[in-house]
Amino acid sequence: MERISQILDNLSKIKSLSGKENQMGEYLHSAYKKYVDRIVIDNRGNVFFHKDALNLENCKNVMILAHMDTIGVMVTHIEENGYLRIDKIGGIINSVLLGKKIEFIKENQIIPGIVGSIPPHVKGNDNISNGMSELWVDIGARNKEEALKDNIHRRLWCHIK
């Protein structure tokens, strides 16, 4: 059987944003089908593994529960200067996003970016907290046309590194 460190490494490399957990479900199904008697995938994509007891007398039921999804962001608007406006996918605190490296994944193409905002001293106040409307992603595009050439578009999801 795989070592737990290898299992965790494999699982952490899968991009499984909220609402797009199918890749994780497929990995779990293929990797662990040899250890169980039945696998059920329901209409919401949840994966259930069943291992029958060898001895039904005095057997205990055990359940292990885990999320298959991760948080992320989605493009809501492309600015003329090439910056991307974003919104959250899943429960994440806005301030946690600031300075995070992210990856847009589109058809085997990975487009890296970093989340930024206008610093408080430039905004003219000491309020460090940023609403989503104050955050943007820099992907290195010099303008909107360059961002569009990189296949960036509204509703494109991305993974937070």
Locations of regions flagged by a protein language model:
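N-terminal hydrophobic/helix-forming segments and targeting peptides
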Residues: 1-161
